[in-house]
C-alpha cells in the first residue's frame, strides 16, 4: 500500500494517508465479534484508494468492503459494517463521533428549521438534560448493517436532495418519545418518555415509517395512516383526491372508502347523463396517490375499499391482476373487499348474492356499516323490488373470483365490517 497518498479531509485540507488510524477504527468496530478478519477488510479497501481521495470516501469504501464479506459462514461482518456505518453517520451529522448534548442539538436543529419549534416550547432545558441522561448511544452498536442503511435511507432527519444527515438513531428515538408525550402532565411525562425510549431503542416495539421520519420535524406527522371517506358527488370525489395528495406528501399511508360511488350506467341528474362507473375515479385516486412520494421517504401507497354487493364488483375484483389493458385495470393501489355475515351465510347455504349500485338502494350503504339487522331487512326488501336495477350471482362464484384474485395478486384484503364495529374501539 502506498503510504504517500494524500487524502482530502472533511474541512478541505489535505494530509498523508494514516493507515494506523484506519486500522484503529477497524479494530474498535471488530471488538467482540466472531469470525471477522480486519486484514481482509483492509486488503479489499486499500486497492480502491487513490491520491486525493476524500476521508468520507475512504470510510464508505471500508464500509462496503466489510458489507461485501457478509455471508452465512461469517454473519458478524454485518455488525462490523454497521458499526463502521454508524461511525461515518455520526461524523457526517455532528462532525465527530461523540453526539452533542441533546438540548444543544435540538436548539441548533430548531434554529435551522429541521426540528419542530414545539420541542423547545414544550420542554425546559432541565427536562432536556434529564432526557439526555436516559439516552444510551451505545445501543447504536446493536444494529445490523441492513438496519443502519434503513435508518439512513428512510428514518433519520436529513436533506433528501443533498443527502446531508442531521441526527443519529438514539436522538430519533428520544425525540419521537418527547413529541408523543408532550401534552402529558409534567410530573409524569418524563417517566413515560424514558419507558417508551427504552422499549423502542431495544426493539421491543416498532414504529411505523411516517412516525419515525415525520414526528419531531416541522411537518408534525403524528398519523401513520389516514382513512378518507369518499361520497358519490364530484365535490366529494375531488375533495378525496385533494386529501390524498396532501396526506401522501405528509408521509401518511392512505385508506380510501370508495364504495359509495355509483355503478356504471347509473343516471346522473335524472338521466341527463349516465355515470362512467367506479374505474375512472379509482384511476383518478391512483394518480393522486402516485403524484408525490411520502415526504421523499417512499412512494405513496393506498388501499381502496368497496362492498362485495356493489354492482361493479366483478370488474373491481380484477383491477389488480396482470391480464386486461390499462383501460380496465388500476394496478398501483391495493384493494379491500367489505363483507358481512349475510354474504357468508349466502355462501354457506349455496345461495345468490344480489349486486346493487349504492345510489339505487337508499339507506343500504349506511346500514351495511351501522346496523346489520337493518341491512339484512333492506337488502332482502330491495332484492324483491323489480323496479331496482340489480344482478344476481351465485355466492360461490363471487367468493371464488375474489379468492382467485387474492391468491394471484396477494394484495386484496378482506374487511369483515360487522366484526370491525363489534371488535374495535372505533
Pin down the residues of each PLM region.
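Extended catalytic cores of very large enzyme megasubunits
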Residues: 1-426
Amino acid at each position: 500500500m502506498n503510504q504517500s497518498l494524500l487524502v482530502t479531509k472533511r474541512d478541505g485540507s489535505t494530509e498523508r494517508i494514516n493507515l494506523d488510524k484506519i486500522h484503529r477504527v477497524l479494530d474498535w468496530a471488530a471488538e467482540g465479534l466472531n469470525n471477522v478478519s480486519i486484514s481482509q477488510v483492509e486488503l479489499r479497501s486499500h486497492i480502491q484508494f487513490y491520491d486525493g481521495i476524500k476521508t468520507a470516501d475512504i470510510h464508505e469504501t471500508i464500509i462496503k468492503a466489510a458489507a461485501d464479506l457478509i455471508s452465512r459462514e461469517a454473519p458478524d461482518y454485518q455488525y462490523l459494517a454497521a458499526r463502521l456505518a454508524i461511525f461515518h453517520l455520526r461524523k457526517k451529522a455532528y462532525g465527530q463521533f461523540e453526539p452533542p448534548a441533546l438540548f444543544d442539538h435540538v436548539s441548533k436543529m430548531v434554529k435551522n428549521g429541521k426540528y419542530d419549534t414545539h420541542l423547545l416550547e414544550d420542554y425546559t432545558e432541565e427536562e432536556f438534560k434529564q432526557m439526555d441522561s436516559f439516552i444510551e448511544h451505545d445501543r447504536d452498536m446493536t444494529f445490523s448493517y441492513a438496519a443502519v442503511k434503513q435508518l439512513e435511507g428512510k428514518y433519520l432527519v436529513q436533506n433528501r436532495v443533498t443527502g446531508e444527515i442531521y441526527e443519529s438513531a438514539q436522538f430519533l428515538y428520544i425525540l419521537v418519545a418527547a413529541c408523543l408525550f408532550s401534552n402529558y402532565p409534567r410530573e409524569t411525562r418524563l417517566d413515560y418518555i424514558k419507558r417508551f425510549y427504552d422499549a423502542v431503542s431495544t426493539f421491543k416495539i416498532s414504529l411505523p415509517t411516517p412516525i419515525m421520519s415525520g414526528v419531531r420535524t416541522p411537518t408534525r406527522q403524528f398519523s401513520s395512516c389516514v382513512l378518507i371517506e369518499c361520497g358519490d358527488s364530484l365535490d366529494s370525489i375531488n375533495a378525496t383526491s385533494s386529501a390524498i395528495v396532501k396526506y401522501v406528501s405528509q408521509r401518511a399511508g392512505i385508506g380510501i372508502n370508495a364504495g359509495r360511488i355509483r355503478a356504471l350506467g347509473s343516471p346522473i341528474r335524472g338521466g341527463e347523463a349516465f355515470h362512467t362507473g367506479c374505474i375512472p375515479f379509482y384511476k383518478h385516486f391512483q394518480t393522486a396517490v402516485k403524484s408525490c412520494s411520502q415526504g421523499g421517504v417512499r412512494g405513496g401507497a393506498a388501499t381502496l375499499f368497496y362492498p362485495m354487493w356493489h354492482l361493479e364488483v366483478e370488474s373491481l375484483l380484477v383491477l389488480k391482476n396482470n391480464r386486461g389493458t390499462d383501460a380496465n385495470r388500476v394496478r398501483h393501489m391495493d384493494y379491500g373487499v367489505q363483507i358481512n355475515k349475510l354474504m357468508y351465510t349466502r355462501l354457506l347455504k349455496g345461495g345468490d348474492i344480489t349486486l346493487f349500485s349504492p345510489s339505487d338502494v337508499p339507506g343500504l350503504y349506511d346500514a351495511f356499516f351501522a346496523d346489520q339487522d337493518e341491512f339484512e331487512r333492506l337488502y332482502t326488501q330491495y332484492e324483491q323490488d323489480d323496479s331496482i336495477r340489480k344482478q344476481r350471482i351465485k355466492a360461490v362464484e363471487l367468493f371464488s373470483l375474489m379468492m382467485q384474485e387474492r391468491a394471484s395478486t396477494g394484495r386484496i384484503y378482506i374487511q369483515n365490517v360487522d366484526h370491525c364495529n363489534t371488535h374495535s374501539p372505533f
